[in-house]
């Protein structure tokens, strides 16, 4: 299911902080996650922000209104890694429940995350501040965050 960009550079809008707080407090967030096959394993980032701070996790982010899932995936790849990716398959939609949040005064987050298996179009990665390190994990995958393990199970 190789897929290339179909609506690149479509304008999107970020939500103002006060509205974002209300959404996080009351609504599940729609997001995309990138399960990146690379060098015989899967590329993960060491998270510096909530949720999942201090864990090896897949790059990902929320979907903006009027943005397709695939356009969100391409945007996230560019913002978090500085590269283009090719979609190999859609792994499915997964529910994630966290007891932490990046929003002050809100103690949880709920995501409906659609995960995609992707490959990198370029090896020149440029991390953003959400990850302090990038590392390829090879099978057998052990000791990873349970949500990452669910994604890896879906690869097989």
From Swiss-Prot:
Its cofactor is Mg(2+). CDD domains: NUDIX_GDPMH_NudD. GO terms for molecular function: hydrolase activity; metal ion binding. Pathway: Protein modification; protein glycosylation; Cell surface structure biogenesis; S-layer biogenesis. A motif (Nudix box) lies at residues 61-82. Its EC number is 3.6.1.-. Gene3D superfamilies: Nucleoside Triphosphate Pyrophosphohydrolase. The keyword Chloroplast does not apply. Binds 1 Mg(2+) ion per subunit. Keywords: Hydrolase, Magnesium, Metal-binding. Substrate binds at residues 14-15, 47. Disruption phenotype: Impaired formation of the tetrasaccharide present at 'Asn-532' of S-layer glycoprotein Csg. No effect on 'Asn-47' and 'Asn-117' glycosylation of S-layer glycoprotein Csg. Mg(2+) binds at residues 60, 80, 130. It comes from the Archaea. One of its GO terms (biological process) is S-layer organization. Nudix hydrolase involved in N-glycan biosynthetic pathway that takes place under low-salt conditions (1.75 M instead of 3.4 M). Participates in the formation of the tetrasaccharide present at 'Asn-532' of S-layer glycoprotein Csg, consisting of a sulfated hexose, 2 hexoses and rhamnose. Mediates attachment of sugar 3 in the tetrasaccharide. Belongs to the Nudix hydrolase family. This is Low-salt glycan biosynthesis protein Agl8. It comes from Haloferax volcanii (strain ATCC 29605 / DSM 3757 / JCM 8879 / NBRC 14742 / NCIMB 2012 / VKM B-1768 / DS2). The lineage of its organism: Archaea, Methanobacteriati, Methanobacteriota, Stenosarchaea group, Halobacteria.
